[in-house]
Swiss-Prot record:
GO biological process, one term: lipopolysaccharide core region biosynthetic process
Keyword Lyase appears in the UniProt entry: no
Role played: Transfers the gamma-phosphate of ATP to the 4'-position of a tetraacyldisaccharide 1-phosphate intermediate (termed DS-1-P) to form tetraacyldisaccharide 1,4'-bis-phosphate (lipid IVA).
GO CC, alphabetical: plasma membrane
Record's catalysed reaction(s): a lipid A disaccharide + ATP = a lipid IVA + ADP + H(+)
Family to which this protein belongs: Belongs to the LpxK family.
Coiled coil: none
Gene name, Swiss-Prot/TrEMBL: lpxK
Name the UniProt record assigns to this protein: Tetraacyldisaccharide 4'-kinase
EC number(s) from the headed UniProt entry: 2.7.1.130
Species this protein is from: Rickettsia akari (strain Hartford)
Amino acid sequence: MIKLLYPKFWQKRNIIAYLLLPIGLIYKFLGYLRDSLARPIMLPAKVICVGNCSVGGTGKTQIVMYLAKLLRAKNVSFVIVTKAYGSNLKSATTIHPGHTALEVGDEGVILAKYGTVIATKNIKEILPLINELKPDIIIIDDFLQNPYFYKDFTIVSVDSQRLFGNGFLIPAGPLRQDPNKALDAADLIFLVSSTNDKIPNILTPYVNKVISAQIVPSNNIDKTKNYFAFSGIGNPERFFSTLKNYGLNITGYKIFPDHYNYLQEDLENLYSLAKEHNTTLITTRKDHIKFNDLNNNIVCLDVELSINNHDLLNEKIFKKAQIFN
């Protein structure tokens, strides 16, 4: 799997973006060809698919966590399906305690605390496991662009700062697909931020299905200390912004590629940086789980989703999707 950082030209067009544009057009054609030839399967339960239009963190994991807690509160049986990014997974697997991020992906390990999770790289491989578990609902994390299964309800997650970047498809830009196509088809659009941002003009036509959501800390962090922050996630800027909005003093930071698998050398270098800055290391839950027993001196910031339009969420999911009937 290719590890990528989010290049600056993905947000603001420059000569590199234009030079890569022809490859983006090929990417678009291949996507069209795949969609045209696909024969989607009907999964044996209602499907809620949570995805995004672009590469990089848009808060999908927090949305899935929120939905899992919502379904559990309603006593609805569900299974979460995750894509096992950054893992060496060979076939679809139900995640159990003891599985590592390298085996099933960092997101899978985190989501397993909220319900039964299947990690897979091929959506069709989940069928035997779903038939065995017999859930009422399947929450699928990512796979939004996957045409090989039917979706009953789709949620598109949009980062409030990056939005759709420079508007170009991979690799000229961050887009996986035409955002208008995804937004038109979406049942709900989550605008995710670390502050209470206003709905941008580009989402105004979809205001009736936009839910503003904030990523907020869910655990207490000592605000009297100084911290050196690091992360290997899709949107490190939002992580750093969350730390500052929480009132922490961040003396420095280091960014690793998304879904990065840390080496012992990385850990040693991080401790050296912390010592140099006379600070404590702090990172995300996705990163923290990769250090196993070696992370005792690293502070972990846990986050959750806070939304301001529960009525819209209830109307769309409970009534329109009728998933609880």
